[in-house]
C-alpha cells in the first residue's frame, strides 16, 4: 500500500515505542504487517528524520529509541558499562584518542562520550568499530586516555 512519508514515519514511531527494535530490517518487516512496503534505505532516512537513535537498554542490547523518549542516564555510568562490554582497546596519536570497539557499537559509545561534556574533548567521529576522539592538546589527551583506560 502506498502511504505518505508522514504516515510511514508515524508508524515507525509507533513501532519503536511499542517494540524492542534492534535493526532497520525489523522495521521493514513490521511495516509489512501494516501492508506497507518500504526498503531499508528509506527506513534509514526516516529514522534519521524522526530523531531515532540506538541506545543500550537495561539488558545491554542496543535498541532504537526516539530522542524525546530516551531516559536520562548518568553518562559516566553508561560509559563504564559500555566500555566493559564493547571496548577492545584505547590508543593515542598526538591529540587524538583511538578507541577500538566490537563491530556495530562505536557510534553508541561515541554518543555517550559526547554527553560527558568534557571541555578538553573537541568532538568524536565514529565508524563501525572505531572512534576518534579529538582533544584540544596532547597533555589533556594523556589525562583523558588514563581516565578512559582506568574504566576498562
Curated annotation (Swiss-Prot):
GO cellular component terms listed in the entry, alphabetical order: cytoplasm; transcription regulator complex
Pfam family, one: Arg_repressor_C
Keywords recorded for this protein, A-Z: Amino-acid biosynthesis, Arginine biosynthesis, Cytoplasm, DNA-binding, Repressor, Transcription, Transcription regulation
Signal sequence segment: none
UniProt subcellular location: Cytoplasm
Major location category of this protein: cytoplasm
Functional pathway: Amino-acid biosynthesis; L-arginine biosynthesis [regulation]
GO BP terms in the entry: L-arginine biosynthetic process; protein complex oligomerization; regulation of arginine biosynthetic process; regulation of arginine metabolic process
A GO term for molecular function: arginine binding
Family: Belongs to the ArgR family.
HAMAP family the record matches: Arg_repressor (MF_00173)
The protein's role, per its UniProt record: Regulates arginine biosynthesis genes.
Descriptive protein name: Arginine repressor
Amino acid at each position: 500500500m502506498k502511504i505518505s512519508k508522514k504516515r510511514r514515519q508515524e508508524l515507525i514511531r509507533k513501532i519503536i515505542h511499542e517494540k524492542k527494535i534492534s535493526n532497520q530490517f525489523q522495521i521493514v518487516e513490521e511495516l509489512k504487517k501494516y501492508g506497507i512496503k518500504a526498503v531499508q534505505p528509506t527506513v534509514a532516512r526516516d529514522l534519521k528524520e524522526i530523531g531515532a537513535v540506538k541506545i543500550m537498554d537495561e539488558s545491554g542490547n542496543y535498541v532504537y529509541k526516539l530522542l524525546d523518549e530516551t531516559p536520562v542516564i548518568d553518562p559516566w555510568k553508561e560509559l563504564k558499562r559500555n566500555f566493559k562490554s564493547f571496548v577492545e582497546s584505547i590508543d593515542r596519536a598526538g591529540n587524538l584518542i583511538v578507541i577500538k570497539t566490537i563491530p556495530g557499537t562505536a557510534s553508541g559509545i561515541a554518543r555517550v562520550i559526547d554527553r560527558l561534556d568534557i571541555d578538553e574533548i573537541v568532538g568524536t567521529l565514529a565508524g563501525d568499530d572505531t572512534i576518534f576522539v579529538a582533544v584540544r592538546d596532547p597533555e589533556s589527551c594523556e589525562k583523558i586516555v588514563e581516565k578512559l583506560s582506568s574504566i576498562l
